[in-house]
Amino acid sequence: YNGLLEVYVTGFPTIHSSNNNYPVPQIMLPAQIGEVTESELVQIDNAIFVSGGSLFSGNNTYDFTSGGQSGKIYIRSNHPLIGLTIPVGPISLIGISSQYTFSVPAIDGYQILPRDTNDLIIPSGLIITSAVTQSNITSTGFDLTWITSDSSTTEANYAVSQPLTIHVNGNSYTKAHTITLTGLQPATFYFVECFSVNGTDTAFSNVGYYSTASNSTGKIRPYFNHSVDNSVSLGVDAQNITIYFNDTIKAYMDRADSTIDICVYNASDATIATAINDAYNRGVNVRYIADDDVVNSMLNSLNPNIPVVYRDPSVQGIMHNKFVIIDAHSENNSWIMSGSTNWTNPSNLFNDYNNLIFIQDQALAKAYTLEFNEMWSGVFGSNKSDNTPHKFNVNGIEIELYFSPSDNTTSKINEVIKNVNYSLEFALLSFTRDDLA
């Protein structure tokens, strides 16, 4: 099952020998890991983790690249690596070749299982010892900072697409590096690889994906369907709109000029269905992604020409998003809708305590569109990649955006918890992560 082999031993096993030496790991590239290597010890050199600088958490996979190929490791619950920093630069990665898949036949899902901290071998010499951090985000540039083990140069290669053809030199020889990218375009995403040189030794970061700020208004509008207490508000006051949740969603859809992308777990509301059909009838390009394992009765009321993609049922999990993207490529009419609300009437829209958040920001809308397009192409769950920028400057407010499971959301939440000084408040329907507890 799941590409795994279960061995059941009747009675007591026979020990033929013990205290044997471990086999020498086989050095290979990620693409060579497969059926013929399962249960064998393998080694990947020059492996660079996509999420370098974050923290390892249990029951999670982590993507890496080596030699232009991609691979995954899996960290089980209670693993010795949990809570430790994910290496930033190239390492030698050792582990047991394994597989976990829901595909039939089982021809994918290959991964490496590191046994302990000794299976991540950090090379001697110059290395990057911190995550690359983005700051001072403007519509024309941003700063990137990192730390190295020894004094070295401050450099980066970047471009809007790979290969990274533009080189910038920070002209500083130090351990604490800051480089500034300037002359960039608003609401535009850039691939950046930071690196430092000391003599003949060079340390590279993973290739990061970063966004400039947009020139949008940055309006943020939170709504709740039950009472709110604005006396404790520290920002934009929330509004209690009670029975008008569906009507509010419709009102924003009515603003769309060119595109509406909808990604919602479950829906059964006639008012919202009417808004979607009206948008399609006036020439708006509408796309809809839904989960495959719930009723979604509202979809029967949509114009049959509106394309709908259901989550791939062969991949474990559910598609639990609730977001809408309106006119993503418009500076002033781009909106994203997020929040906790499914579109089920009356349960989620009116009875259960839920919220909606609308943000007018082109950069955020374009990032949500990247995630939408990945799922629109049929990629869901553990097959997704960490392919969006994560930090945004929305009219002076820093917003971070992560999608699960590809973006190591548990690790990001854990980092926030570890940095809490005085109080932590959260509102959740379900809480099952022991590592966060």
Functional labels for PLM-detected ranges:
Residues 1-125:
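OB-fold nucleic-acid-binding modules
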Residues 29-65, 248, 255, 259, ...:
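Surface-exposed interaction/gating patches
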Residues 46, 95, 260, 323, ...:
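A residue-level signal for conserved active-site and pocket-lining positions in enzyme catalytic cores
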Residues 48-51, 98-103, 151, 161-164, ...:
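Acidic glycine-/aspartate-rich tracts in secreted/extracellular proteins
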Residues 104-106, 200-206, 348-350:
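Beta-sandwich strand segments
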Residues 124-214:
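Short, surface-exposed linear motifs at loops/turns and structural transition points
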Residues 214-255, 263-418, 434:
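HKD-type phospholipase D/PLD-like phosphodiesterase module
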